[in-house]
């Protein structure tokens, strides 16, 4: 059965098998002989079908109402088993908002059985198809603002979105490119620029998913409206809400008022991008008929930054037309058609229009109501949609089009369209790491759901949070051109063409943005409808690297083979050349003293350092833009200015004046910096070590790893993982960074990245996190593909000819067991599959995607690979190659990397992951969150081992005391046994109650035997001279422990710290940089 299959039979809304029995008896009692006979004759077949169907989470399993639960618990039991299965808990015990979350990897469905009484953005799924999108609240439909929880730590700041709007979060509906025009925003970068041009942020359209259900019981009315207080909604039990990562359908099901079983199914159609469906089914398991009212509502008050044009109804449905704020010449329309077996009445107020149907639900029967919604805007086809009537006419046509069939047929066509994109096999699989497996599949889904192939004009725009949120005003940053694009390009190149089309659409404005007297084009930091320079989106004296990202996007598409020389001439070259021209004339200046080209008054990606000179990432990116312009010009036979070559070969790069030669983020940077996000590290990826060599790149990685602040955004550590994959020759930091990139940032239950590792504005550095943070989904995909396989779209260029190469540098993955598999990678008009297992890398050419493609692809294995060189892989051929294997950082260790698992029992500092303790890299660490409590870590050596000694490398915050204990028993054989059955002095056992059905707890002292305890001496005292250098420490505080014992499990405990004053604002506990046992 396909994911999200209904427990109702699709054609006649028949109930599930348990109530089916009751229905047969009820029919027989009324002498409905033929019906009863048919029911009984098919009972055995139906029951057998459901046994087969009962694979947990095959779509949306039916949950038997608690007040009338049969002894046959097939569906309920299996879902409960899934939620509490070790495989499922292994994922969600690591993620926030995930107490009752589940993931069914077979059907690729995520969901939760926990009813969120309070609507919170982290707990909400959404639907989207690249043109329309909507966030879905707890009841499965409708509009609500976020609601403050009853937690003692809840505060009003929890309800707010971030810069630049700082508005209250809500379950909004959005249309691609539907940007407004407004004088200003609450937050800006350069407020003085507001005088030069208005802002343009995304407008939320009226919420189209609202389909409420009302009933009166004992004189009190209850309504399924998520904006109401819980008392007005009524009791919700047996709750399940899920989202398919294969087709994007969101399904919500529950028992309401202990009386009805209600199911909502919502989709944004993948193929018919203007069409949304809300399908509701209500089942009455009782013995009396019940009257209910279904209301289809379009409420203009659920919109944001829109102006109402008309709200009304006709004989077939209801509709609303509107403009984005400040733009009367741009129109939007929503038309809703209700399909129900009853008399529909319609009414309206000044800002709301309803269509209602009163239905009688007979005992043991169900009713089905479907809402077909057409949504359109002028931007989709400006040449055809010239008036509001044109847009409304089209929306009405979409809503009432009989060709799409009934709800079941619409669901089927939607799934069919999705299957053409993702095909049958999962695009990424981590067989041995369920969290990475979910993160990869979710990231592909979220980026595909929020994009569509070849979108034109402003509808190709993709904001930081896609089509379900107005985080960052829905505006377009470099996040789209660099982070999202490089993440999804290898899987769906047609989708990323939309990003480039959007930049082409605004290219003339970018030309107009250039100051008088200069040439080229300059894009603003933020873009909406117009692409002009604004208070949020300055063009000058700020993040010039946005222009490199825009240029790089078109260049990457070209060298990937997804675009040809026609694209190069008409699209890529104008963008690249105009960027080069502007940068060469306006941004770059020749410094006679240095004999180099320099830059001034800019901001690199690290936005903690504004108005600096010679940003390392920016200067390096400028070099590449100059090179691309020259190569593209040569291919096309165009003359390019000599200055491009001069800048390419003589760009200044600031470096530290010592033997380590660390690249400075900007001229004059000192050692006290706290870096917001990946910056210099990005010189290695995606800028491929331009201006630096491998040694300098490696020392950069080590230095800047220690300088990242603990509250930076989620795109930082995917880059560190990629760079460690590329550079590290010992240890397994590539894999520890990979977990650091996902575990603190991914939110359950619907596997969406948050911008921050801590969502609390009061404690995370003052950020209201963007959500969902598609930037991180794109970054994570790059970490697993471009990182672990080393895949790069590369080329050679000789005699004005560009030869495409797929560069590969696959590495061994000791911490990831069976490795990783990739299917349906698109390169040079071919489909490839790639896999890393324990010993080899395998690549298969699965054939052409276009008839005119060559019969082969050319790959280049990196120099460090034992089989370095070029290889031709013909269509349908497969080849295997060795992996690059790092050596051990600590020879003879029994605990480094995959030899042991380190698991924190007490909380770590925000963003830290315990795998950093044994990854063989002293510049990564795990820090105890608090200094006034004991930090505890459990070590699993994976088998019974003889241990003679241990080494603790503390980093810059050694504890005052350390204690090591061993487990000598035999009843506990897994980490979860300890977590579930041992009282470590915190509430950890409550999170693992599923693994302790008897509820018996053991005291820590009864389980572990102390084998070492001692004070930690300072072996590397603080050296002010060293501290004030831009320098990776070569001295470490180390504690050596001599023991003689045998065990599999160890407990490490650390107390307090030596520092009496905080270093760099860090008030946490002890840091464990590396722990090694021999």
From Swiss-Prot:
It catalyses: alpha,alpha-trehalose + H2O = alpha-D-glucose + beta-D-glucose. This is Cell wall acid trehalase ATC1. Substrate binds at residues 478-479, 676-677. GO terms for biological process: carbon utilization; trehalose catabolic process; trehalose transport. Gene3D superfamilies: 1.50.10.10, Glycoside hydrolase, family 65, N-terminal domain. GO terms for cellular component: cell wall-bounded periplasmic space; extracellular vesicle; fungal-type cell wall; fungal-type vacuole lumen; membrane. Disruption phenotype: Lacks acid trehalase activity and decreases hypha formation and infectivity. Belongs to the glycosyl hydrolase 65 family. The keyword Hydrolase applies. It is found in: Secreted, Cell wall.
